[in-house]
């Protein structure tokens, strides 16, 4: 399949094509982020990268099998507190127009356009008018441990040059929960918040700013005898014959604590009666009473939320990896959509 990918990011489109069992004959990608280009090129050396979509001549890709992409949703998302665009104008719309231009100039057999569900109705309607049909809404929670609701416009070229909608059924629910993808620790939720471009933290999570974290159960072991004490994760110190933990294991108050007499420190939080305290304020939480460190999700855990295969590598910093994953696609959702395109393509070949 000859692919033209706009706003390609970390090449989730290439990952999805592989997952759907579709051979990639040629893959041209438009992307300007140097870290995205470095990462996708590292994993897929065959990708040919180009620059800015605004300067592209998409007629050179005439005869492409598929155009895929999702213009940056930053300007349209409800998470955009300042200067959110709600009409079909502005920077966000200009970016979409480049995608629409790519369709018009390259005349692909199929296309997939993705964007955030939280865009305004006016923008959603304008996109649907441009394509000639309504999108399908799919929540990544069906195939992963992440709530991520996205709109997908999936089109097939007609004989008159326009496009008709390919009907996409909802994926089967795989029943994957957040606890299933954690490398360690526990969680108070069945599904993660929608992955964003930066790692979560305790403050944002507890204040419902929708960044995801995990909880690591710990035991604070204070010095006693030959035991130097310290924070003990996962395992308690040796249980003595009298049934005690050598008298020095305590559930601590939610303050900044660490090894007693040591310079190393960690934020420790106590959950008691369904509440956790952060900066003097209580928040309800569904965790067993106990003693926890709150940590951000690891890069590997975020990969699992986006159903990125374990072999995929990031030759960039974790900060950039989080950004790429947060801005990327849920691979298995795109692969699900591609299966329908694959079936339709086979029907077309059979008629020839």
Specify the residue positions occupied by each region the protein language model found.
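Conserved active-site and SAM-binding loop architecture
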Residues: 1-352
